[in-house]
């Protein structure tokens, strides 16, 4: 016997997923399968693998409309015209049809018994003994109905148990407990949870929390015991009761089996749905060349939509480079290998995508250029260039010539600007080179000039203020006042005002100078004592002429002969220190102990070194030096304090007279020395 011929024009078989060999069609749906595959399938499942319709017969070896072979199938209509009710139940297609009555009639209509009884009654009513015949007929009919009902119930229970056993043995989905939120452990267990809740609500009067706890317990025991009805019944006895537990467990297992079974609906063939529909689309590996058949129309459309079609691929011959023109060859020779690729694209303005809108790309000035002291950015910002490989660069404007290094160094120098310097070399060189850098400007001003702005208001105000200060003429120094002599007298009496007192008249100096040798310390002391006499005696103030005469006489006496130096010490070479009373050391030490604590206090050696080259003095230093000189003179001349050092501090040119000594003398001696 020749092997069955293949029929690739019919597509692939949904059972073996191969080309159909020995085509056979199921009646009445006319779905095509392999003859061997569909016969094995129908041995335990009298339904079509595609549409789940009951199969009446198989048609194969079709030569024409009148020449074919037919194989009857047990799943077709029986002699009484009824269909097999177990097919849809086994494969779980009637989940939404409600609970299944396992005791329903298997092959008879619900009114079959009634019709038979009515027929018997009508036949018996014709004779004289119709009543008795009708009674016998009703009794016989009732007996037959009871026997049929018991048989149908037994067959239904056996079918349900057989279905549960088949699901437990075959491949199925796992049974899972509920989640912590009292939900089903998997989506396919939702109907099991709903059935358990309905059964518990119909049996017990419980609250929502109690119902959730009981449902979780039932689902946990179902996941633990599985399809073991004895173990599950023992676990349900404390909750349901010993009498009701077996029936509850049998119904629970039947509902769970319907939800976890795996039917042939997971094997959707190529012809079950159009392209783009739901289901798994299997690839057609046949070598069919027929294009005119209707069955192949689905294959052609699926080939274009499956993503595996090679019709849109580029052939190898089409990937060769196009011949270049003479212009392109010349352009590549002049600009290099990358120039030829960029020359194929027109010079267009570059754009950047901003969520659907096309806006010109703007390239801001980088901040790194603003931080450089000598800017390198061009005066005019260049247009953005294309970042794509082989793109043409946009033309750039030529940059301004850069200033010479010497000019840049002078522009960046920190020296102050002179009159008219703002418009001079530094600003001109900086603006020409394209970077705004001034001689005293900071980072903010350089950044403002680089960005083409005048800068913030505070920067503008600081720039104007510095310019005004630099351009303002320098005032001429004021002439220093003549130094006041140390011998200027001050009225130191208790009730006298703190004002200078004139020295004694020249006539009063004669007796004092008569007994003293000119140029000796005794003569100088006599002159000083005579000058202080009017102040102590509260005399009248002499005229300025007398004061000038006394001052000149004392200076002449002190300069006629040099002051003899101590033994073993050379005479002083400084004319300022020659002939002056050397009381500066003691005065400085005493002033430091009494009224000069802190930063202005210096040792005597440092002050002595400063006397040789005093340098410029501040107003505070001059005032302090004057106070120390007057205090030293007061202690030596009036209080009789012995000298401690021969170093004397001569008056400096340009110095000025210190303040009044009333406060100083009152702080030193309390004023008691002057009232005695």
Swiss-Prot record:
Quote the protein name from its UniProt record: E3 ubiquitin-protein ligase ICP0
Which is a Pfam family this sequence falls into? zf-RING_2
**GO MF, one example:** zinc ion binding
Zn finger intervals (RING-type): 13-52
Bias (Pro residues): 474-484
- Under Enzyme Commission nomenclature, its number is 2.3.2.27
* Gene3D superfamilies given in the database record: Zinc/RING finger domain, C3HC4 (zinc finger)
Q: Which portions of the chain have biased composition (kind: Low complexity)?
A: 304-314, 375-388, 397-411, 555-597
Comp. bias regions, Basic and acidic residues: 440-450
What is the role of the protein in this entry?
Evades nuclear antiviral defenses triggered by dsDNA viruses. Acts during the initial stages of lytic infection and the reactivation of latent viral genome. Prevents the antiviral effect of nuclear bodies by degrading host PML and SP100.
Q: How is it modified after translation?
A: Auto-ubiquitinated.
Q: Where is the composition biased (Polar residues)?
A: 351-361
Q: Where is the composition biased (Gly residues)?
A: 110-135, 422-439
Which chemical reaction does it catalyze? Answer: S-ubiquitinyl-[E2 ubiquitin-conjugating enzyme]-L-cysteine + [acceptor protein]-L-lysine = [E2 ubiquitin-conjugating enzyme]-L-cysteine + N(6)-ubiquitinyl-[acceptor protein]-L-lysine
Alphabetically sorted, this entry's keywords are: Activator, DNA-binding, Early protein, Host-virus interaction, Inhibition of host innate immune response by virus, Inhibition of host IRF3 by virus, Inhibition of host mitotic exit by virus, Inhibition of host RLR pathway by virus, Metal-binding, Modulation of host cell cycle by virus, Modulation of host ubiquitin pathway by viral E3 ligase, Modulation of host ubiquitin pathway by virus, Phosphoprotein, Repressor, Transcription, Transcription regulation, Transferase, Ubl conjugation, Ubl conjugation pathway, Viral immunoevasion, Zinc, Zinc-finger
CDD domains noted in UniProt: RING-HC_EHV1-like
Q: Acidic residues bias located where?
A: 286-303, 315-328
Q: Which SMART domains does the record match to this protein? A: RING
BP GO annotations: protein monoubiquitination; protein polyubiquitination; symbiont-mediated disruption of host cell PML body; symbiont-mediated perturbation of host exit from mitosis; symbiont-mediated perturbation of host ubiquitin-like protein modification; symbiont-mediated suppression of host cytoplasmic pattern recognition receptor signaling pathway via inhibition of IRF3 activity
Q: Disordered: where is this region?
A: 101-135, 266-486, 555-676
